[in-house]
């Protein structure tokens, strides 16, 4: 992550800034690499940037944010959906549950506890920097355009169900 957020003071500053609605979105530096590829090189400057994190990003925000009263569930929704949809010109098709929107929704269980592992999400990556973190609050079901596409860490949607979402151009 560039820049890294390491100190307790930095972490506290980020959460307080989010709580005050001064940060619009939270993203990941997700790069689905295997550890041997990431570390392939002689110096830190040779290492590949980023790390696999998209699979735990929502659980981290639920566990460390909502469940520790650093942010509200409404703020989380804005950070992860509404604001991004508006910024990227996809609102109201995305980021909204209003009539004529796609009404995509992720159901979460704020009490579900699970350890983060690379095996949890399958795929190419064989590591996570959050290995064995016990997180409380996980997504349990994702619905896209009325169809369940993910349930209990498993993709259950039909291949090819994705759809291009046209963006509105921004006027300058």
Residue ranges and their predicted role:
Residues 95-99, 120, 171:
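Juxtamembrane/interface motifs at transmembrane-helix termini
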Residues 1-9, 48-53, 129-134:
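A short acidic, glycine-rich active-site loop
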Residues 14-16, 95-96, 132:
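Short, flexible, glycine/charge-rich loop motifs used to bind or transfer phosphoryl groups or to couple energy/partner
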Residues 164-172:
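Short, solvent-exposed cationic patches
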Residues 19-26, 31-110:
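His/Asp/Glu-enriched, well-ordered alpha-helical/loop segment
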Residues 39-43, 102-165:
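C-terminal cap of metal-dependent C-N hydrolases
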Residues 1-26:
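Histidine/acidic residue-rich metal-binding segments in metalloenzymes
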């Amino acid at each position: 992550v560039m820049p890294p957020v390491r100190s307790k003071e930095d972490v506290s500053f980020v959460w307080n800034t989010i709580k005050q609605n001064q940060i619009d979105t939270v993203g990941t530096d997700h790069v689905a690499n295997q550890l041997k590829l990431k570390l392939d090189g002689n110096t830190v400057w040779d290492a590949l940037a980023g790390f696999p994190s998209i699979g735990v990003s929502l659980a981290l925000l639920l566990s460390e944010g909502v469940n520790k009263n650093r942010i509200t569930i409404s703020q989380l929704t804005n950070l992860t959906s509404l604001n991004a949809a508006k910024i990227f010109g996809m609102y109201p098709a995305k980021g909204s549950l209003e009539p004529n929107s796609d009404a995509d929704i992720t159901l979460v269980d704020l009490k579900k506890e699970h350890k983060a592992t690379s095996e949890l999400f399958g795929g190419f990556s064989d590591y996570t920097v959050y290995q064995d973190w016990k997180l409380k609050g996980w997504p349990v079901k994702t619905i896209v355009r009325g169809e369940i596409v993910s349930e209990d860490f498993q993709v259950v949607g039909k291949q090819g169900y994705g759809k291009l979402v046209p963006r509105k151009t921004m006027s300058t």
